[in-house]
């Protein structure tokens, strides 16, 4: 039997970290060799998450570079923004492959990162090596990458909805409007007033209107796809459910003669080799429940011939395809494995 790949998770006690643990425990080719969580160092992981205690007996450890390099070949950094860039250079120097789930290595230009996220960066050479970790768009680059900046849930759902339109030049890029709705787990596990049950239940609210930090990330990739500078109108909303994301995208068509069947044919061809994307048939629109617990993004669309606009909808699990599952999908590519290996494709229903 082939030796299993030894992987580590830094930030193992958060929502992203525990999703990585859950998914990797069912991955046939890996072994979890290290769990890093400074605030819970010395605590058995099974005490933090008793539902997993029968599957993993590892103790959370302090985050120490030498220990990670000694224990692992691959490491996932499921840390808040601003931490990964202090760890990645040393991990790469130690010969590890690094998958960063934060925003630290998603940007081509570090000045853009600093203007939206703040903080000082002294890792420009390392950042230039990073590959944007959306497999459906950058699969071949990811295969050979040592450092992957994995996109989050809003960019993933938005970009998968927009990519065929921009790549094929089907829309006026200046008309791109993205309305996004996320479950409260997208805010992470740290205590925040807006995530409290009494605040979030039975309420839908927009936030960070015209200034959400994922805007420049979405625009960076949209511009790359379109071959020109693209600006988007992006508005996120918090909805009263634990997990799930629904994006509704609107754009003006360049060819008003296109109909929904034409657009579906274009999307099906674009994602034909993308096992994590399901393009739905005519008149079928995605629901967040379909994607719950899976690494699948569902896409539906309609052409409004009256307004000459296309409406594209995408639904995914913000903690799986929007975070941890996507990182594992990228890891699979770097190892030459089938990219959905170990990843769930069928959700819970009802």
UniProtKB/Swiss-Prot annotation:
Molecular-function GO term, any one: N-acetyl-gamma-glutamyl-phosphate reductase activity
Pathway listed: Amino-acid biosynthesis; L-arginine biosynthesis; N(2)-acetyl-L-ornithine from L-glutamate: step 3/4
UniProt keyword list: Amino-acid biosynthesis, Arginine biosynthesis, Cytoplasm, NADP, Oxidoreductase
E.C. number: 1.2.1.38
Catalytic activity: N-acetyl-L-glutamate 5-semialdehyde + phosphate + NADP(+) = N-acetyl-L-glutamyl 5-phosphate + NADPH + H(+)
Annotated compartments: Cytoplasm
Highest taxon of source: Bacteria
Active site: 153
GO CC terms: cytoplasm
Entry keyword Oxidoreductase: yes
Annotated Gene3D superfamilies: Dihydrodipicolinate Reductase, domain 2, NAD(P)-binding Rossmann-like Domain
UniProt similarity note: Belongs to the NAGSA dehydrogenase family. Type 1 subfamily.
Function per UniProt: Catalyzes the NADPH-dependent reduction of N-acetyl-5-glutamyl phosphate to yield N-acetyl-L-glutamate 5-semialdehyde.
PANTHER family with a match to the protein in the record: N-ACETYL-GAMMA-GLUTAMYL-PHOSPHATE REDUCTASE, CHLOROPLASTIC-RELATED (PTHR32338:SF10), N-ACETYL-GAMMA-GLUTAMYL-PHOSPHATE REDUCTASE, CHLOROPLASTIC-RELATED-RELATED (PTHR32338)
Protein name: N-acetyl-gamma-glutamyl-phosphate reductase
Lineage: Bacteria, Bacillati, Cyanobacteriota, Cyanophyceae, Gloeobacterales
